[in-house]
Structures are given as structure tokens and as C-alpha cells.
């Protein structure tokens, strides 16, 4: 039996079949006590992949203006995957966090700043000691405005890296969001339920310059 190289993206023909039944989702976010699925009319949604989603979700729920956060899977082929399937490298999904936010309190540009400054966006199919395509850096955009802001922020951060002497090319993927599949309940707000749990989040000491 051939082994799977988890640092390589797979094709759709090689992906696990998944299932038609969605993962059960808790009714309320355990930190904010808001709906895990509903998006109020005045709120917006952003989706980020920065490595293991446990620490990423906590980073965002701690910010002002955040209505809810959710850990999940996106960017692959397998419908309604399980955590075990994603970790196998056979779904092509990334671990990601869906952020519902109030743009009157915290802007998308501010979320992008948190994204760039709190992980290493130049590691390809890994994040620190977490190795595999599910740990890749990605921004999944939901509007043309998010796409433009994300692309412009990438250019600014790449330049800031060079000015710090880091000549690596950013590997962050910026693509329109496809289906977001909620992770199992054990993974939702994991570091609230397990305060001493693993968090692999960490930046590279570079700040995102503000938009011009």
C-alpha cells in the first residue's frame, strides 16, 4: 500500500468520497453565546486558514466586534469530511476559521492584520511543527472587495518581510470561498474548553503596513 505525502495537494479523483450528511453543529458559540450558523444582517463573514484551527479560532474570538467563530474545513473536494479524513491528506481541505464580525467595530483590514501577523505565511504545506496540506496558509474571500483587500495586503506584507531581511516568497493562497464544512463539536472553541490545550500560533515578527 502506498503512503500519502501529506505535503502534496491531491486531485479530485484521489479524494475520499465523504458523505451527504453535514456534521452536527452546536446551537450556540460557547464563548459569545451567539448562533454558530446565523449571520445577522449587519454582520459580515471572513474565512482564514493559518495552521491548526484551535489557536486561530481563539485569536479571533478574543477581538472586539466578533459575533461568532467556527472551526471547519474548506478548499478541498470531500463533502462533509471528518477531522480524521482531513488529517489523512486525502480530502485537500485546509483547517480554517469562519469569522462573523461587525464591520462597524472591526474592519476586514484589521482582520487581515491579525491574519498576517500571527502565523508564518511562507511555509507552504505546514505551520511550524504541524505538517500537511491541511495546515496551509489561505484566505478564502466572499466578495470582490475582500479579494482586492487580501491581494493588496499580501503585497504589503511581502514587502515588509523583505525589508526585515526575510526573502522567502509568501505561499498564502487567496481564492474565492467554496463550501465551509463545520468541524466536529470537540474542535469548536477548543481552547476555551481546554485552556491548556495545544496552540501552534505564532508570527514571524513582521508587522503589516497600513493600506496606502
Swiss-Prot record:
Source species: Pectobacterium carotovorum subsp. carotovorum (strain PC1)
Pfam families cross-referenced by the UniProt entry: PMSR
Catalytic residues as annotated in Swiss-Prot or TrEMBL: 52
Family: Belongs to the MsrA Met sulfoxide reductase family.
Enzyme Commission no: 1.8.4.11
Function: Has an important function as a repair enzyme for proteins that have been inactivated by oxidation. Catalyzes the reversible oxidation-reduction of methionine sulfoxide in proteins to methionine.
Cross-referenced InterPro entries: Met_Sox_Rdtase_MsrA_dom, Met_Sox_Rdtase_MsrA_sf, MsrA_MetSO_reductase
Gene that this polypeptide is encoded by: msrA
GO molecular function: L-methionine-(S)-S-oxide reductase activity; peptide-methionine (S)-S-oxide reductase activity
EC class name: oxidoreductase
Classification via Gene3D superfamilies: Peptide methionine sulphoxide reductase MsrA
GO biological process, one term: cellular response to oxidative stress
Composition bias, Polar residues: 1-14
Entry keywords, A to Z: Oxidoreductase
Reactions it catalyzes: L-methionyl-[protein] + [thioredoxin]-disulfide + H2O = L-methionyl-(S)-S-oxide-[protein] + [thioredoxin]-dithiol; [thioredoxin]-disulfide + L-methionine + H2O = L-methionine (S)-S-oxide + [thioredoxin]-dithiol
Record-given protein name: Peptide methionine sulfoxide reductase MsrA
Chain intervals for the UniProt region annotation (Disordered): 1-21
Gene Ontology CC terms: cytoplasm
Amino acid at each position: 500500500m502506498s503512503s500519502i505525502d501529506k505535503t502534496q495537494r491531491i486531485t479530485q479523483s484521489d479524494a475520499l468520497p465523504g458523505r451527504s450528511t453535514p456534521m452536527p453543529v452546536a446551537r450556540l458559540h460557547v464563548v459569545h453565546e451567539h448562533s454558530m450558523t446565523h449571520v445577522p444582517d449587519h454582520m459580515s463573514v471572513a474565512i482564514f486558514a493559518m495552521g491548526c484551527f484551535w489557536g486561530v479560532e481563539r485569536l479571533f474570538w478574543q477581538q472586539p466586534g466578533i459575533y461568532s467563530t467556527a472551526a471547519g474545513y474548506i478548499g478541498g473536494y470531500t463533502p462533509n469530511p471528518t477531522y480524521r479524513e482531513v488529517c489523512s491528506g486525502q480530502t485537500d481541505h485546509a483547517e480554517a476559521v469562519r469569522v462573523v464580525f461587525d464591520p462597524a467595530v472591526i474592519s476586514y483590514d484589521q482582520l487581515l492584520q491579525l491574519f498576517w501577523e500571527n502565523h508564518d505565511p511562507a511555509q507552504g504545506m505546514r505551520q511550524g511543527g504541524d505538517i500537511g496540506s491541511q495546515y496551509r496558509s489561505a484566505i478564502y474571500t466572499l466578495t470582490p472587495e475582500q479579494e482586492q483587500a487580501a491581494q493588496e495586503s499580501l503585497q504589503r506584507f511581502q514587502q515588509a518581510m523583505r525589508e526585515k531581511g526575510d526573502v522567502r516568497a509568501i505561499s498564502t493562497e487567496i481564492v474565492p470561498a467554496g463550501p465551509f464544512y463545520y468541524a466536529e463539536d470537540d474542535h469548536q472553541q477548543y481552547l476555551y474548553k481546554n485552556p491548556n490545550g495545544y496552540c501552534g500560533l505564532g508570527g514571524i515578527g513582521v508587522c503589516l503596513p497600513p493600506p496606502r
